[in-house]
Amino acid sequence: ARHLLLPATDTEGLHLLCSEGEFDDLLADLALHRLDVVLADRPAPVNPNLKVYSHALGEAALMWYASPALRALSDAAFPACLDQMPLLLPSRHAAVRARIDDWFDRKSLRPHVAGEFEDSALLATFGESGLGAFPATEWSHDELTGQRGLQLLGRCDEVVEHFYAISAERRVQHPLVQKVLGQ
């Protein structure tokens, strides 16, 4: 989310309030104007009773990372190495999870899932501690390999995570939301 919000963070006097919640609950709060925007991994469903609008922000390929100690456990090339180490995955609530599972099937991978996480930052923290290898978007690469010292296992261009800003207005009026949308 940080990458998506960067265009709005150069605003003087900015006060961000970022909340997490169930997708449907966030959309309901948005429709009631309790929120200015919802950042999501999927567009809002078509619902005549819910006046919200999805704006595509972009997409990013997934890359797989592991701690150096975990990577040392396997000499197999990517993606076969994923079968030889525990994995940490987004929970099934994340839209990308179904695409990851489909990719495992296409590659005939049967990995051991050591943990499932709603929060990608928490997932990366446990990955950094060596609990398992994990996917993250290419936007996180420099932070994960530089600041956190993780090793890149491989790039997975076949699995892409999509990002949307969902608003309660078709033509967004809020100036910070306009910045996020690149307007």
Model-identified regions with their sequence ranges:
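A late-sequence structural motif
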Residues: 73, 151-183
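Generic preference for hydrophobic
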Residues: 18, 37-39, 54, 64-65, ...
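Flexible hinge/capping segments at coil-to-helix
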Residues: 51-92
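Hydrophobic hinge/microswitch elements
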Residues: 22-26, 31-34, 41, 95-151
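Short beta-strand->loop
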Residues: 52-63, 146-160
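Central regulatory/effector-binding core of bacterial HTH transcription factors
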Residues: 1-46, 117
